[in-house]
């Protein structure tokens, strides 16, 4: 079992060709997130790919967030259909991912915002980062 905000070092006996981190990394405090990114780099074979998504400030969660704390997370409180309290690391623009995901070499920066015909709360915008271990 992985403890919250813990190292993943030593969990795997073999290296990998791809790491897929979809809608999960933005809950990790910045210091630990950077540590995990370095561990991802170590876990990948040369030529291995990291696919990751991060929540953007265009996402409706940001409009419910408080000031960013020293650990890089902002408290988010949502009431209504979604009733939750989260702590999220928001990304301002896609280019910010290049610095965050160093030492990976960037292959692709993009974004997505799932279509929601009913638009319950607002945008679900996320940024996409794809990088390679050289």
Regions found by a protein language model. Give the residues of each.
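Short catalytic micro-motifs in class I SAM-dependent methyltransferases
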Residues: 23-27
